[in-house]
Amino acid sequence: MNKDEKLQITKDKLIDSTFRLMEEKDDPMSVTSREIAAMAGVKPGMINYCFGSRENLIYQTFQKQYLDFLKEKETEEIIRSDVPPKEILKKLHFIVAGCLVENPKFTKAVSGFVLFKRDLGRESFSYPYVYRHYEGKKTEAECRLIAYELSTMMQLIIYRSEDFRKDFGIDLTNPEELKHYIDMRIDLLLA
């Protein structure tokens, strides 16, 4: 086994251990580097070596779960469908928001990282559809920015879902209200 394969095995162990520990806790961000390393059977320094920080490991753990979720059959059917990109975005964001609403403790755990520390150069799942929607009428940078705004706004609304219910009367746990809100947001940003 070569060095890269061993490193990938270590990364996978760290991600799996992080996910299991986060599921056990009321506050997923309270998971410590030492707990993660102990469960993974590696030294705590491997977290920084592999991921740069505990926060990035937590984010990567969330990303793995999120990407697995996006590979589900329903999502693949939407992506392959022959509907306009804006409609694909509405459907995908509704599915993703549903996942985020169902897992509020994970959403809250990664929101700070997503909003303040995530590499903005990384492509979001929304970008290709935003770009196709504008068909060259906006630059690549403008389309990336719109995709980023869609992503960050989704994180914020889910993070503050109780405030949305209290202050605006929008119950994001109600699928119809969630869909209406997402459609409205996408219509505003992709006018």
Language model features: what each stretch is:
Residues 13, 21-56, 60:
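Helix-turn-helix
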Residues 23-29, 69, 73-75, 161-177:
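Short, flexible, glycine-rich and Lys/Arg-enriched loop motifs at helix boundaries
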Residues 60, 74-106, 140, 146-147:
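Hydrophobic alpha-helical connector segments
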